[in-house]
Structures are given as C-alpha cells and as structure tokens.
C-alpha cells in the first residue's frame, strides 16, 4: 500500500466562522493555526496547504488570563537605529483588535511561502459582522 500524498489541486477547502468572544487568546490561536494547516484532515500532508478558511469575529472580546492585559508587550523594529517600538496588549486591543489574534496565529504557523499562504486564509474582524456571507461559512465551536 502506498502512502497517500495530497495534491494542491485536489484539496477541498471549507469556510468556517469562529466567535472569539470570551475565548482565551492562546488556546483559540493554536486551534485556528491547526485548522489553517489542515491537521484536522485525514489527507494532511506537511508540504501541501490543505487547510480551511477561517473567519474570526468579535476579536475585540478575546480574553487573556492573569495580568497579561497590562504586562504583555508586543515589539517591532523600524530597522533604523533606536527604532524599537513597543505596545502593550491593552493599547493594541483598543487600537487594532484584529492584530492581536493575527499575531498570535501567525507565530504558530510555519515560516516561508507555505506559512504565508496559510496565513492569507485567516480573516479577522473586530466586530460581529463579516463580509464573507457569499462563501456560506459553517459555525465552528472551539
């Protein structure tokens, strides 16, 4: 018996919608990353993008435990000398609530072209509305 290897053109991708309200950030992000990779499917192949499309709503209502709201800091650098910027979780969730979940999921995906292709299938919205009704997404309880 030969080992099954999925081909990119034969992979069937579904659309799912996830409500992030009250969910813990890391637990939610790890499940979303796993689904974006396609690890929940029997035909999972590491070098093929077999994951589904994930729409996340209510990203502004995601929860963190402990004092992480005040203590968790996100860093970025402008590549200029002295260009290190930082922002706390509290400020980032107020300014760009989608970015918190996007950064958490992106850090759990592989680096390189395949990881970027997986990341493009993630759609995050701060509120309860999304504009992917035409794709008829199924509700996914995580």
Curated annotation (Swiss-Prot):
GO CC aspect terms: cytosolic large ribosomal subunit
Any GO MF annotation of the entry: mRNA binding
Protein name (record): Large ribosomal subunit protein uL13
Domain of life: Bacteria
GO biological processes: negative regulation of translation; translation
Job description of the protein: This protein is one of the early assembly proteins of the 50S ribosomal subunit, although it is not seen to bind rRNA by itself. It is important during the early stages of 50S assembly.
NCBIfam families from the UniProt entry: rplM_bact
Keyword hit for Chaperone: no
Organism: Vibrio parahaemolyticus serotype O3:K6 (strain RIMD 2210633)
Subunit structure: Part of the 50S ribosomal subunit.
Alphabetic keyword roster: Ribonucleoprotein, Ribosomal protein
Transmembrane segments: none
Entry keyword annotation includes Ribonucleoprotein: yes
Matching HAMAP family: Ribosomal_uL13
Similarity annotation: Belongs to the universal ribosomal protein uL13 family.
């Amino acid at each position: 018996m030969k080992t099954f290897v999925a081909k990119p053109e034969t992979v069937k991708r579904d659309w799912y919608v996830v409500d992030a309200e009250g969910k813990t950030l890391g637990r939610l992000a790890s499940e979303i990353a796993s689904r974006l990779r396609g690890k929940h499917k029997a035909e999972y192949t590491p070098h093929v993008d077999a994951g589904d499309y994930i729409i996340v709503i209510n990203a502004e209502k995601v929860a963190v435990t402990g004092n992480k709201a005040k203590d968790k800091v996100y860093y970025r650098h402008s590549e200029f000398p002295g260009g290190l910027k930082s922002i706390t979780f509290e400020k980032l969730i107020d300014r760009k609530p989608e970015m918190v979940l996007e950064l958490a999921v992106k850090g759990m995906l592989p680096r390189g072209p395949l990881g970027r292709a997986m990341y493009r299938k993630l759609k995050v919205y701060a509120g309860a509305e999304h504009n992917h009704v035409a794709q008829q997404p199924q509700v996914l309880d995580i």
